[in-house]
């Protein structure tokens, strides 16, 4: 039986794409994933993940990567969970070899609902089991998570070469916040790599606009 695993990387950052990856492995090869060191991607260094990438794709019968741009994230019609359902289904439907059973890392607080929503969008029959922290429980999901993280890391490195070092891209990162503030002050807008709908990004924009408006008013009233 063919087993599928699916996960994403980059849901939370204010900068860069969301990457969804799915992997299909024959059930007899699941042990091979464990043997090469596939586990929760968060427990692996970027170098270790990169080394595992080609080994995973060699063991896999099929895999698919979907990259979702910041612009598409900002222009989504629904929630981030709904966008993930849509992109998980897109990745699974794009597979040449269809799995009969799919393990998914649940984005929704209701894991069963998340599974059901994806299952309804499949163009083939498969059973989906969605669980929280599935990437730490199932090697096939760990494998998908590793692929997603490696591709996202590569995308981020490309962006840093073009836009400079913006840190991790997460809103909580002081380096990222400083980069966002400095970029907006200089250009009066954010580049297309930034998720403009993120609260941190909106607050930075509003704060800088308010300060500029105040300076304009101050100059006006200081006129002789």
UniProtKB/Swiss-Prot annotation:
UniProt key word Cytoplasm: yes
Gene Ontology MF annotations: manganese ion binding; RNA binding; RNA-DNA hybrid ribonuclease activity
One cellular component (GO) term of this entry: ribonuclease H2 complex
Enzyme class: hydrolase
Main location: cytoplasm
CDD domains reported for this sequence: RNase_HII_archaea_like (cd07180)
Subcellular location per the Swiss-Prot or TrEMBL entry: Cytoplasm
Keyword Hydrolase on entry: yes
Cofactor(s) listed: Mn(2+); Mg(2+)
GO biological process, one term: DNA replication, removal of RNA primer
Reaction it catalyzes: Endonucleolytic cleavage to 5'-phosphomonoester
HAMAP family: RNase_HII_A (MF_00052_A)
Listed name of the protein: Ribonuclease HII
Protein source organism: Pyrococcus furiosus (strain ATCC 43587 / DSM 3638 / JCM 8422 / Vc1)
Gene that specifies this protein: rnhB
